[in-house]
């Protein structure tokens, strides 16, 4: 079998009922069009629940490669195709970002705000993939650095949000929020979220933050259950640096990047968040306005709208 000139990495939420059927459809259509498929080892038949049967596919002339889910799993691919919900998309976005390629989501979840299409439209999605008929948007990401006792103790990045949270079963977390080197407010809270416009419809929204349109360049700061008169969300410049200092005599805390990558934050630490130089490349098929997506995904009532 001649090696394919094109390869797509498929990342799948194997806990979804329709995952196997949809994945097999992807496998067949890409194979019929001479595009090799790469899958993660945890999702392959011999080591995972997806039952993709790589050996059977190879025997039928379909090129499929099984790789470990390391940070460079998407290197050499042209696209990361996601079958799952927003959690699966965020997991796949990390692989796409590391390889500097686009990520395209097909929703198998409940809301799937980050997905471009639903599972029933998989054939149409694959037509676009085969023809490379999609546009690519650069979505802003955040860089986070943790400093403790004057030295960098940890660092990370996020597409949706950086979430500082108090530890389990601990009391109120005492923090001071600083923007561009100037203190804004000190308060007790359950945590503080720093979000991109992309993440404004996720955890930050649940914590009371506003929805930011994705073409707006800004950073959103949302105190979570703040014990303060001034505990309101703030929208800052995309060039701003947001710092959150934890009381030295207070509790340890945790930072989660996109709800996945976790950092332990000792009391007295300082968390600095700013715009990251490296964006996530987002493959777009849907030309509808963001307003329509918002209404559709959140099932917002629009009865009575008269228009022009």
Swiss-Prot record:
EC number: 2.7.1.23
GO CC term, one of those recorded: cytoplasm
Record-listed NAD(+) binding positions: 86-87, 91, 160-161, 190, 201-206
GO biological process terms held by the UniProt record: NAD metabolic process; NADP biosynthetic process
Catalytic activity: NAD(+) + ATP = ADP + NADP(+) + H(+)
Protein location: Cytoplasm
Enzyme class, first EC level, given as a word: transferase
Listed transmembrane segments: none
A GO term, aspect molecular function: NAD+ kinase activity
The entry's keywords: ATP-binding, Cytoplasm, Kinase, NAD, NADP, Nucleotide-binding, Transferase
Residues forming the catalytic site: 86
InterPro entries: ATP-NAD_kinase_N (IPR017438), ATP-NAD_kinase_PpnK-typ_C (IPR017437), NAD/diacylglycerol_kinase_sf (IPR016064), NADK (IPR002504)
Cofactor(s) essential for the protein: a divalent metal cation
Keyword match Cytoplasm: yes
Purpose of the protein: Involved in the regulation of the intracellular balance of NAD and NADP, and is a key enzyme in the biosynthesis of NADP. Catalyzes specifically the phosphorylation on 2'-hydroxyl of the adenosine moiety of NAD to yield NADP.
Similarity-based family: Belongs to the NAD kinase family.
Name the UniProt record assigns to this protein: NAD kinase
Gene: nadK
